[in-house]
Amino acid sequence: LERLQYLNLAQNQLTGHIPSELGKLNIYRLNLEFNQLTGNIPEELGSLTELVHLNLESNQLRGKIPVSLSKLKRLKKLELQNNQLIGKLPEIISGWKVLEELNLSNNKLTGLIPEILGRQDSLKVLNLSFNYLDGDIPINLLQNENLELLYLHVNNLQGIIPETVCWRENPIKLLFYSNGFCPPYPECIKYIGKQICGN
């Protein structure tokens, strides 16, 4: 397996835990999506330092996102959606300097959206929908001109969406429905959806 660069075992009805031995490979892409894998994401995956794309979407993975993944300095795309991951969004995000797409939707993540996400200049797509995130949206995230898509719908977010989101030079696709944002809403947001405002 020394010459293996891309491991794709998607949609194979695989069960059990993700083998920690995968961390010994020298691959740039790992795709295990749409299986029935359980347990935690192995810390050993942090040893895949050449990894550009990690896709563990649509399994039954539990636990927290391991801190070891901060070692994946070349990571451009991380897809962990449709699992049962818990905990807060980790500060290890700061280690992903070239990350372009991050999808953590449909998990059980809690806590605040870290401001570090707004300083990820490479980030183009961020999907945190269908979790239990609360607090405000970091202003610097809305002002990130490289961000093209921001999905935060169906969380427990609250506060006021700042008008500065309308001052962007580059367009962005936003979905905020089913949160607790209070009016007034920025004029440039055409669809805010149902909100449960605490005021």
Where are these regions (language model features)?
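Consensus "Asn ladder" position of solenoid repeat domains
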Residues: 12, 35, 56-59, 80-83, ...
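Conserved hydrophobic beta-strand positions in leucine-rich repeat
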Residues: 7-9, 28-32, 52-56, 75-80, ...
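Leucine-rich solenoid repeat scaffolds
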Residues: 142-199
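Short intrinsically disordered, low-complexity coil segments enriched in acidic
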Residues: 1-13, 182
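The feature encodes a structural signal of leucine-rich repeats
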Residues: 15-20, 41-43, 65-67, 89-91, ...
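Leucine-rich repeat
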Residues: 1-4, 23-27, 46-51, 70-75, ...
